[in-house]
Amino acid sequence: MSLVAYASSDESEPDEAEPEPEEEEAVAPTSGPALGGLFASLPAPKGPALLPPPPQMLAPAFPPPLLLPPPTGDPRLQPPPPLPFGLGGFPPPPGVSPAEAAGVGEGLGLGLPSPRGPGLNLPPPIGGAGPPLGLPKPKKRKEPVKIAAPELHKGDSDSEEDEPTKKKTILQGSSEGTGLSALLPQPKNLTVKETNRLLLPHAFSRKPSDGSPDTKPSRLASKTKTSSLAPVVGTTTTTPSPSAIKAAAKSAALQVTKQITQEEDDSDEEVAPENFFSLPEKAEPPGVEPYPYPIPTVPEELPPGTEPEPAFQDDAANAPLEFKMAAGSSGAPWMPKPGDDYSYNQFSTYGDANAAGAYYQDYYSGGYYPAQDPALVPPQEIAPDASFIDDEAFKRLQGKRNRGREEINFVEIKGDDQLSGAQQWMTKSLTEEKTMKSFSKKKGEQPTGQQRRKHQITYLIHQAKERELELKNTWSENKLSRRQTQAKYGF
């Protein structure tokens, strides 16, 4: 007998618990078969110790005439005597009757009262602390008893999909659960799901007219969007699965990055590209209009090929060259006459003129203007001026000042004077003994380590040869340097 039998009898099982007392009452009168067959035919005694509970308390549906004594004919049909509870399930000793054994159990106080569990309506025992021989026979069960808690039956729907979520919410969200989660307080920053929020990405819900002019409000809206996206992850009362949480977090992160990149693109389109030094990339000439493409007017004394280039070479280089070569213009004295032959002396006479001489000194004392690229310059259209331009280029090749006056001085340089020690170099290269050191010691050229340690004669000879070669080289180098100083300074 165990205590589990009290918890196993519930209100929902009246049909199983009622017929058991009948069997027990049928067995109870046979507690003393060892006293003889006369006591077996007598009814049950009326004492409080062995009196079973009345049938009105345990089984009111069955009348008492149904309690029949066992047959007395064949002793084999009689059931074995029940073991009293006071002796722990062991048979009484041979000199003790079952009544005395029951009295011993009563004196020890081993009779247990009925447990007061939830949902059990058992009457208290009649005999006080008497032996529980009149109690119903315990029913043995293989499975443990499962008592359903009332908190689990709150939901109205019986669908299988809602059941795991309800169990999770009882353990996590509500304070009625058991375990560590019941001891924890409610979270302070509890987010609530928005009901009217559209579950669309920002790229689809955004209008195409929105964009560059209001970048700051869009950034504020993005912050609110990201805050509103947070409840999707895990704010509802039903906790989703971790895979759904990960998927929602990934989608939210992708939406935020897309929104940030779109805002950056809009801001890049709005703001013009600026230089790091706050300077425009292309230096546009501020006063292009007052400078027409015909080359600006220059003093009339200048020759046609020597006008200074304009300040803005980009515009002037692409423009067609216009030379002031008109016959009636002031540049007429620079025009060559078709019947004259200009020699070098005639060009040198221009340098003697007062106005032209002043021009040359002023022109060449200033900065030098490089000639334009011949690929950009169009071919000359005026044929008789080609020889004049070639002569002018030839005049530039002579010198900057006093053209035609300087004399060419030829300086003779002899190679023998520069290469005074060539003979010594040749003799040195021919007679120098080079040290051909091989890395292999087996060929006999290099001494071995054992020869160096023991100072053998072969190592000493090799060392003398090396020093003799070094001595010869130093002597020849000193002699060469002495010859070079004599050839250079004369002493």
Swiss-Prot record:
The entry's keywords: Cell cycle, Chromosomal rearrangement, Nucleus, Phosphoprotein, Proto-oncogene
One of the GO biological process terms: regulation of cell cycle
Signal peptide interval: none
Q: Enumerate composition-biased segments (Acidic residues).
A: 10-26, 262-272
Query: Which InterPro entries does the protein's record reference?
Result: PRCC
What is one cellular component GO term in this UniProt entry? nuclear speck
Instruction: Name the tissues where it is expressed.
Output: Ubiquitous in fetal and adult tissues.
Q: Where does the record place Low complexity bias?
A: 40-49, 111-120, 230-244
Q: Which Pfam families match?
A: PRCC
Where does the record place the region Disordered?
1-244, 260-313, 432-454
| Localisation per UniProt entry | Nucleus
**Chain's role:** May regulate cell cycle progression through interaction with MAD2L2.
Quaternary structure and partners? Interacts with MAD2L2; the interaction is direct.
* Protein name per its UniProtKB record: Proline-rich protein PRCC
Upper taxonomic lineage: Eukaryota, Metazoa, Chordata, Craniata, Vertebrata
